[in-house]
Amino acid sequence: MRALVEISDKQFFVTEGEKLFVPTQKAEAGDTLTFEKVLLQSDGAAASLSPSCKVTAKLLRHIKGDKVTVFKKKRRKRYRVTRGHRQGFSEIEILSVA
């Protein structure tokens, strides 16, 4: 069973048992999350828009992504600024699509 689910304003096409990285969730590692905003459900042959479908997932861990370096400069003024940013992600495992 596959489903197109919206998690934190981003859409993911998920299957049972799949692990994926989503934007940081407000839960602790080991907690069970339920996503009720399912946009599409498919069983391989047919797809349906089921409003009663839910996706259950287990939060495995919180991690940070790769570092992105931001560099700003103004010419002839000796102005240079370097900043770094690491986006936070949560790793989840899809338990069921029902």
UniProtKB/Swiss-Prot annotation:
Keywords from the UniProt entry: Ribonucleoprotein, Ribosomal protein, RNA-binding, rRNA-binding
Name listed for the protein in its UniProt record: Large ribosomal subunit protein bL21
InterPro entries in the record: bL21-like, bL21-like_sf, Ribosomal_bL21, Ribosomal_bL21_CS
Any single biological process term in GO: translation
Family membership: Belongs to the bacterial ribosomal protein bL21 family.
Top-level taxon in the UniProt lineage: Bacteria
One Gene Ontology CC term in the entry: cytoplasm
Gene designation per UniProt: rplU
Pfam families xref list: Ribosomal_L21p
